[in-house]
Regions:
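Conserved active-site-proximal phosphate/metal-binding subdomains
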Residues: 2-129
């Protein structure tokens, strides 16, 4: 959820990529950091998986290879969308919009209150009150 708040450090281009993606648009790759990380598939991840290309190096060496590219994708997001590092879990398919953090917290509090009210009703019914 925090990837999709206005206050996140993600670029608007990155957040739009998350909105458009589904859970099948992710891949587990070592291509950016050297450690397995779930991210959106793109030309970068596909190139690292292409037969004949080298395997990613271990951490921290792989990031020494890719670190400048990651920085460039944040600096020029519109021009680098096809190779950007977009770490995200399979929950990406549930992202629909960018919100303010306060709105997310308010929604969660309301959902909590509704859930506890429902549990109270179930408990009262079970106790025969």
């Amino acid at each position: 959820q925090w990837l999709m708040v206005e206050e996140a450090e993600n670029t608007p281009v990155q957040q739009q990529a998350y909105i458009e993606a589904g859970s099948r648009d992710t891949v587990r790759s070592r291509s950016f950091t050297g450690k397995p990380c779930r991210m959106l598939k793109n030309d970068w991840t596909e190139a690292w998986q292409t037969e004949g290309n080298p395997e990613p190096l271990g951490m921290p060496l792989q990031y020494m290879v890719s670190g400048m590219a990651v920085s460039a994708t944040h600096r020029w997001p519109d021009q680098t969308v096809d190779v950007a590092f977009n770490p995200v879990g399979q929950v990406v398919g549930q992202f629909e919009k960018v919100e303010k953090t306060g709105a997310v917290i308010e929604r969660w509090v309301n959902e909590y209150l509704e859930a506890t009210e429902h549990l109270d009703q179930l408990n009262e019914a079970a106790a025969g009150v």
